[in-house]
């Protein structure tokens, strides 16, 4: 299933990017990267990725997550991931990036932590 990327701004100043589908090599995954870069350019660097509807992630997707995290942190911001599914979490653990990324059980936990 192609990746769907939706963005919303909360009154608290947090930006939520909701993802649905597969985060894999291709234009769809680049849309996520572009969305994060656009937010950084707008100085909106408190970002939560709602991953609860992501069914699969490949190595390119992991790279985009890590790269996005690095860009946000370099810009002085915070990026958290909410509701990572067990299948995706397994990939993040295998690649050892689960220790780098800020992962929360659900969106409410990410919003409270950011």
Q: Which ranges hold each PLM region?
A:
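Short beta-strand/loop segment at the start of cytosolic alpha/beta domains
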Residues: 1-18
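General small-molecule cofactor/ligand-binding pocket signal
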Residues: 6-8, 82, 104
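Residues that form or immediately flank small-molecule/cofactor binding pockets and catalytic motifs
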Residues: 10-12, 86, 108
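Amphipathic alpha-helical interaction surfaces in cytosolic regulatory modules
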Residues: 22-101
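A charged, well-structured terminal subsegment
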Residues: 102-114
């Amino acid at each position: 299933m192609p990746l769907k990327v939706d963005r919303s701004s909360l009154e608290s100043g947090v930006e939520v990017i909701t993802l649905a589908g597969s985060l894999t090599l291709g234009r769809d995954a680049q849309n996520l990267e572009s969305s994060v870069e656009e937010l950084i350019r707008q100085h909106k660097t408190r970002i939560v990725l709602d991953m609860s509807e992501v069914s699969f992630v490949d190595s390119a997707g992991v790279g985009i997550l890590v790269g996005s995290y690095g860009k946000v942190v370099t810009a002085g911001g915070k990026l958290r991931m909410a509701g990572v599914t067990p299948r995706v979490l397994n990939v993040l653990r295998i690649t050892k990036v689960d220790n780098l990324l800020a992962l929360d059980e659900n969106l409410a936990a990410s919003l409270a932590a950011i």
